[in-house]
Amino acid sequence: MRALLRSLLLLLACIAFGARADDAGPPQKEYVPKSGTGRVVVVVSGQTGASNYTSISQDFADAGYYTVLVDGNDLWIKGGGGNALLQGVIARAQASPHAVAGKVGVVCFSLGGAVGLTYATRLPDQVATVVAMYPLTNFIKDPVDFVGKIKVPVLMLAGTADTYHSCCVIEKARELADAAKANPDVAPLFVLHEYPGADHGFNMNTSHQRALVADSRDRAIAQLRQYLVDH
């Protein structure tokens, strides 16, 4: 009886420890598809916070994906560690009863785009594809070296008039695209779609460029449908 009691106490301690470990990760809000289950899509917000990306997260859920939204500020942190945090977000999402097993899609915006491009694109065992909208790229000093580390399909959506804090300019996006084209291993994986005259945040419902809200959403969903099938 005492041995059984000790085993029970040990089990409870392990469960409590696991719960604390889960709680230690960045907060993530879930959006459940109408079917109740779906392949996982992780949405990483820009610097303005997760609240500005609730609408598009719901759009992904409406498209049939179990979607979790995280704040990019929690993952793009000084001193590193964001890679492990992102993998923790993915693992928790995959452990949900609403998740269908398989690799995940990552959709990221602005600051969150740096998370997606730097970390998610290098996780081929966990990530099927990355969609990066107006991603932060001004930290990239060597485009050739950077894109050489990409291991999963990437769709980058960028506006040609994006001058927001000089974080996400089209010139750097084009440098990355050119570097990808010159690398035979990466060329099939990297697609840059430009929106002429578009500025930052073109996907938001507050955007004055209303047509781009739907177009960017539809392109993201098409990318997810293409790669969240056999992975």
Give the location of each predicted region.
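C-terminal catalytic histidine-bearing segment of alpha/beta-hydrolase fold enzymes
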Residues: 185-231
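Short beta-strand/loop motif that positions the catalytic acidic residue
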Residues: 150, 156-158
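Primarily recognizes the serine-hydrolase "nucleophile elbow" in alpha/beta-hydrolase
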Residues: 51, 88-149
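Conserved alpha/beta-hydrolase
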Residues: 61-77
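Short beta-strand element of the alpha/beta-hydrolase
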Residues: 37-46
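Active-site-adjacent alpha-helix of alpha/beta-hydrolase-fold enzymes
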Residues: 61-62, 160-191, 198, 206
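The serine-hydrolase catalytic nucleophile loop
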Residues: 48-57, 72, 168
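Alpha/beta-hydrolase active-site loop
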Residues: 77-97, 220
